[in-house]
């Protein structure tokens, strides 16, 4: 089994991105699966162009995209990506689409094809906080998740794909009072065991409570 893991470069006012720093430290084999990582630009459309090129080159069985969600307290596998860009800030090339469909011929939304609840359980068993997220936002993270699942729908039907947000690294919150952070070591370990779950749960997810009341 081959798994492609992606990590965004820094964006906004941040000098580092924990997603990229973490994926760089992943071992080349996890739970018997071959793992490769690729850096993704935090740029609408260019991000998915880089992803598709790497999919064509590597031919992975699964794609796990990783992104920073500053303020979140744990690792959060995303349930769904929506067909809408609505950028609060410009991307790294100054693009700021507002209320713009990502793909005219795509679905209104795509659900992750990764075992998100098994991933959450695996992370929590390591003593790390994790929960299913029901919104990937409307910035480049949601854009890339949507594009990955669009590619599954239109071009790579045997591939699985999904997205997981991670918190800030501790050094990013030194001057951000009351903002959660996590050590890079713990972030890497959380991603590793999430990948273990992706390998173990190829056909169906665990049936565990992961919903919200609001």
From Swiss-Prot:
Which reactions are catalysed by this chain?
A: Release of an N-terminal pyroglutamyl group from a polypeptide, the second amino acid generally not being Pro
Q: Matching Pfam families, A to Z?
A: Peptidase_C15 (PF01470)
Keyword presence, Hydrolase: yes
Q: What is its EC number?
A: 3.4.19.3
The EC category is hydrolase
Which Gene3D superfamilies does the UniProt record give?
Peptidase C15, pyroglutamyl peptidase I-like
The record's active-site residues are: 78, 141, 165
Q: Which InterPro entries match?
A: Peptidase_C15, Peptidase_C15-like, Peptidase_C15-like_sf, PGP-I_bact-type, PGPEP1_Cys_AS, PGPEP1_Glu_AS
Q: Tell me where it resides.
A: Cytoplasm
Q: Give a GO cellular-component term.
A: cytosol
**Alphabetically ordered keywords of this record:** Cytoplasm, Hydrolase, Protease, Thiol protease
One GO BP annotation is:
proteolysis
State any single GO MF term.
Answer: pyroglutamyl-peptidase activity
- Family of the protein in this entry: Belongs to the peptidase C15 family.
Q: What does this protein do?
A: Removes 5-oxoproline from various penultimate amino acid residues except L-proline.
The record ties this protein, via PANTHER family, to: PROTEASE FAMILY C15 PYROGLUTAMYL-PEPTIDASE I-RELATED, PYROGLUTAMYL-PEPTIDASE I
Q: How does it assemble?
A: Homotetramer.
Name of this protein:
Pyrrolidone-carboxylate peptidase
**Highest classification ranks of the organism:** Bacteria, Bacillati, Bacillota, Bacilli, Lactobacillales
- Its gene is pcp
């Amino acid at each position: 089994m081959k798994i492609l893991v992606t990590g965004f470069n820094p964006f906004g006012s941040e000098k580092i991105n924990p997603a990229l720093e973490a994926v760089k430290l992943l071992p080349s084999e996890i739970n018997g699966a071959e793992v490769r990582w690729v850096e993704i630009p935090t740029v609408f459309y260019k991000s998915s162009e880089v992803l598709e090129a790497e999919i064509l080159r590597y031919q992975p069985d699964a794609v796990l995209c990783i992104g920073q969600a500053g303020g979140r307290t744990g690792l959060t596998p995303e349930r769904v990506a929506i067909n809408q860009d609505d950028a609060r800030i410009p991307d790294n090339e100054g693009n700021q689409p507002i209320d713009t469909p990502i793909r005219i011929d795509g679905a209104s939304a795509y659900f992750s094809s990764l075992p998100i609840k098994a991933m959450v359980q695996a992370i929590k068993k390591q003593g790390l906080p994790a929960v299913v997220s029901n919104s990937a936002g409307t910035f480049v993270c949601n854009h890339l998740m949507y594009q990955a699942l669009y590619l599954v729908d239109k071009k790579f039907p045997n591939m699985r794909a999904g997205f997981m947000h991670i918190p800030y690294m501790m050094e990013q919150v030194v001057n951000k009072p009351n903002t959660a952070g996590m050590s890079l070591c713990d972030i890497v370990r959380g991603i590793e065991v999430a990948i273990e779950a992706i390998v173990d749960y190829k056909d169906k997810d665990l049936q565990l409570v992961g919903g919200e009341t609001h």
